[in-house]
C-alpha cells in the first residue's frame, strides 16, 4: 500500500486534504523557535506519577552486576544505550558493592533518561545526590580521551 502511494506520488505535487492543511496551519502558530544547541526541556506533568524504583539490598553482587549490564544496554534511547553499555563494559567488572549501588541509583533512580545524558555530557549541572564517584567516572568516559569509536554496543 505504501509502495503504491509512493510510486503514485513520484513526480507529482502531493496535495494535502483540506482538514490536514488547516491543522498544519494552526500548529504553525504554536511553533516555538529555538536557537541551535538550545535544550528544550519541559517539566513532567503533575498528573503523571513516577513510580519508585524498588531498592534490592539483599541482591547478590554478581546478580546485581548482571542486571545492571542488561539495564545499561536496554535504555530505550540509543544515546544512553551506547554511552552506558560501553561504560559498563569498561568499568562494571571492577566495581565493588558500594559502587554498584551508586550506579544502580544513578540509572534507575532518575525518572528521565535525558537527565542522565545531559549530566554525563555536562550540558546540565548534575544534582548533588547524583554527583558521585560513578558520575565522575561516567563523565570522563563520555569525554572519550582515547578517541574510541562508539557506534555500536560492545559484544557480551
Curated annotation (Swiss-Prot):
Source organism superkingdom: Eukaryota
Gene3D superfamilies on file: Flavinator of succinate dehydrogenase
Segment annotated as transit peptide: 1-24
Keyword Methyltransferase found: no
Annotated compartments: Mitochondrion matrix
Pfam families, per database record: Sdh5 (PF03937)
GO biological process: mitochondrial electron transport, succinate to ubiquinone; mitochondrial respiratory chain complex II assembly; protein-FAD linkage; tricarboxylic acid cycle
Annotated keywords: Chaperone, Mitochondrion, Transit peptide
Principal location listed in the UniProt entry: mitochondrion
SUPFAM superfamilies in the cross-refs: YgfY-like (SSF109910)
Cellular compartments per GO CC: mitochondrial matrix; mitochondrion
Subunit structure: Interacts with the flavoprotein subunit within the SDH catalytic dimer.
Family listed: Belongs to the SDHAF2 family.
Protein's job: Plays an essential role in the assembly of succinate dehydrogenase (SDH), an enzyme complex (also referred to as respiratory complex II) that is a component of both the tricarboxylic acid (TCA) cycle and the mitochondrial electron transport chain, and which couples the oxidation of succinate to fumarate with the reduction of ubiquinone (coenzyme Q) to ubiquinol. Required for flavinylation (covalent attachment of FAD) of the flavoprotein subunit of the SDH catalytic dimer.
Protein name: Succinate dehydrogenase assembly factor 2-B, mitochondrial
